[in-house]
Amino acid sequence: MKKILLTNDDGYHAKGIKALEQALENMAEIYVVAPKHEKSACSQCITITAPLRAEKIKGKEGRHYRIDDGTPSDCVYLAINELFKHVCFDLVISGINLGSNMGEDTIYSGTVAGAIEGTIQGVPSIAISQILSNKNKNTPLSFDLAQKIIQDLVQNVFTKGYPLKGRKLLNVNVPNCSLQEYKGERITPKGYRLYKKEVHKRTDPKNESYFWLGLHPLKWQKRENEDRLSDFDAIASNHASITPLNLDLTSYDDLKSLESWHEGMLK
C-alpha cells in the first residue's frame, strides 16, 4: 500500500490537516507529523539551537506525532530520518493551509517549506492551500473542493507517476468557491505579489509598543512578457492553480552579464 506523510504549518490540531487526512485515508497509509503550535510564515526554518521533543499521539497506530515547538521542515526531516526511518514514503503533502500561498508568499510559507523539505529528502512533494474569504481563520469553511482536488491529484501521481524530476515540487492553491462554481485546474507560473510597507503599531497596558506585520490585502500584477495566467489570475477566476516550483534559485539568465560586470575583479 502507498504511504503518505502529512505535515502543515497551522499546527497538529488544525482543521486543514484533518480534512487532508480524511481525503486520503482510503487511498494510502497515512502518517502525520505536525507542529504542536501554529508556525505560519516560518519559511524553511529548522531547529538547530534547541532540542526537539516528539509526542506520539495515542490511538493512531503509532503513525501520528506532534513536535513541540517544531517547524514544518523539522517535522518532515524528523519523520523521514528518525520517527519513520524504516518507511519508504511515496509522497509528502503539506496542508491544507488556511490561506493562500501564491507569488512571493511561497518564500515565507511554512506550508510550502514542508513540501520543500520533503523534496530535499528525496520524496515527491505537494503543498496545498485553501483561499480564505477574509483573514479570520475561525470563519466557517468547507474543504470539500480542496479534498476533491488533492484526491484527484494524488490518484494521478499514483497512476502516472510524479510529473516533476529533480528538486522540484507542486504548489496547489484552491479557490474559495463551491463545487458548482469551480472552473477546474490551471497550470500556472507564480504571480508577482505586491507588498505594502505596512506595520500595525499597538500599545500594551504597560504602555510598551508592539507590532503586527503582514496584514496587508492580497494584490498582484502581471509579470513582464508573461502570457500565461498566474496563480493569482487562476484563483480570481475560480480555478485552482497548480504551480511547479524549483529549489534551484540561481538566476541563470544573469550569469554571463554578471561575469561582464565583474570582469577585472575575478582572479
UniProtKB/Swiss-Prot annotation:
Entry protein name: 5'-nucleotidase SurE
CC terms in the record's Gene Ontology section: cytoplasm
Pfam families in alphabetical order: SurE (PF01975)
GO molecular function: 3'-nucleotidase activity; 5'-nucleotidase activity; exopolyphosphatase activity; metal ion binding; nucleotide binding
UniProt KW Chloroplast keyword: no
Record-stated family: Belongs to the SurE nucleotidase family.
Classification via NCBIfam families: PRK00346.1-4 (NF001490), PRK00346.2-4 (NF001494), surE (TIGR00087)
InterPro entries per record: SurE (IPR030048), SurE-like_Pase/nucleotidase (IPR002828), SurE-like_sf (IPR036523)
Domain of life of the organism encoding this protein: Bacteria
PANTHER family noted in UniProt: 5'-NUCLEOTIDASE SURE (PTHR30457), 5'_3'-NUCLEOTIDASE SURE (PTHR30457:SF12)
Taxonomic source organism: Helicobacter pylori (strain J99 / ATCC 700824) (Campylobacter pylori J99)
Binding-site residues, a divalent metal cation: 9-10, 40, 97
Cofactor binding note: Binds 1 divalent metal cation per subunit.
Function recorded in the entry: Nucleotidase that shows phosphatase activity on nucleoside 5'-monophosphates.
